[in-house]
Amino acid sequence: MTISKDDQARLYRYYTEPTLVTELTRKTLALVLAGGEGSRLKDLTAWRAKPAVPIGGKYRIIDFPLSNCVNSGIRRIGVLTQYKSHSLIRHLQRAWGLMRTEVGEFVEILPAQQRTHKKEWYQGTADALFQNLDIMQRHHPEYVLVLGGDHVYTMDYTQMLLYHVQTGADVTVGSVEVPVAEAAAFGVMSVDESLRITEFNEKPREPDSMPGKPGTALVSMGIYVFSKDFLYKALIEDAGATRSSHDFGKDIIPSSISRARIMAFPFRDREGKPGYWRDVGALNCYWQTNMDLCSIEPALNLYDCEWPIWTYQPQYPPAKFIFDDEGRRGEAIDSLVAGGCVLSGARVKRSVLFFATTVGCSSLVKDSVILPKVRIGRNCRISCAIIDKGTVIPDGTVIGEDPVEDAKRFHVTPEGIVLVTPRMLGQNIYARWEDEYDG
């Protein structure tokens, strides 16, 4: 039987790539930048770091990059923390103790410790790595995978590692295409025909469109693969640059384009289509990402058994829907409802309810994100809202129907999304939960 050259190439990849991938992942150290303040999320990050914000009914944002690492076979992971990190650290301790330390696996927390002679906290993304340079070197990686802790997506990092090695890159930058109107929030890049980056501008005021694709810009995902020698040298040089802001997107990547091989890696899903990736750094983006998960066939598939999203699961009973009378029927439509929730003659439509939330009789919740342990009273109407953890909504409350009235008590975004927190209602969640409080 004659085998075509294409089939021969496929067979060769089938038998050789798994070994190569295993070698690459073993030689890779992943570092997750999780120290961001998240000021655009307003009061949602008043007492938690942005990567610790709950999402999708049962997860924290940081669970997505960490799960991507584990599912990709990358089991040496450091998480760099700084801003209001207690709830994040507590979650990492509960959810991510699954590694086998005796075989070299770990999720290690690297808090800002003023480790250099300057005695400063992390001054930027590059400085965060520089202050942990000795720890990186101690693990002897060949490649360092740098990830943001505040993005929602599923991605096999081994494909990016392979691409990095096969293209001979010093740095590989994960990239996605976004509407040019949204590109000012990201690092915008230009590439040549081989996808080598020729220009990189961090958060430009007037982003350029891609050649041949008007209205579309190529932007950075905040995901980088570095070859270790290049990274160590770049970090040391940047640390000594007095005018640097010590940031990868603002300083190291742009300044290295002329002297290093920096490649763009287009993010694709398993079918070769543009992958689902969301920066949930603003309230409207956070709300929309949760709403995306309520669609019939969401672009981000939480039900993929081959790519699970790992997390800590509190021990609550199944969700309960009670009463079946006209005007008092417990039901949820196109929604995600976590364990411990009770819908007592209430209706929920196109919403995400986190664990241990109760909704009282004859209330309606639609197009909303309800964080854990919220109590919604009777005869309430809530729409287009984000209700923070532990909030008690009094009977008869109406939210999301009158922006002017909502703005008197709550935070209302330009898109009309209403953020409600316990503090806005004069409530003290710490006093009510006592020992039950878990961030």
Swiss-Prot record:
Alpha-D-glucose 1-phosphate binds at residues 122, 187, 202-203, 220. Keywords: ATP-binding, Carbohydrate metabolism, Glycogen biosynthesis, Glycogen metabolism, Nucleotide-binding, Nucleotidyltransferase, Transferase. GO terms for molecular function: ATP binding; glucose-1-phosphate adenylyltransferase activity. It holds the Pfam family NTP_transferase. It comes from the Bacteria. It is an enzyme of class 2 (transferase). One of its GO terms (biological process) is glycogen biosynthetic process. Involved in the biosynthesis of ADP-glucose, a building block required for the elongation reactions to produce glycogen. Catalyzes the reaction between ATP and alpha-D-glucose 1-phosphate (G1P) to produce pyrophosphate and ADP-Glc. Belongs to the bacterial/plant glucose-1-phosphate adenylyltransferase family. PANTHER family: GLUCOSE-1-PHOSPHATE ADENYLYLTRANSFERASE, GLUCOSE-1-PHOSPHATE ADENYLYLTRANSFERASE-RELATED. This is Glucose-1-phosphate adenylyltransferase. It comes from Thiobacillus denitrificans (strain ATCC 25259 / T1). The lineage of its organism: Bacteria, Pseudomonadati, Pseudomonadota, Betaproteobacteria, Nitrosomonadales.
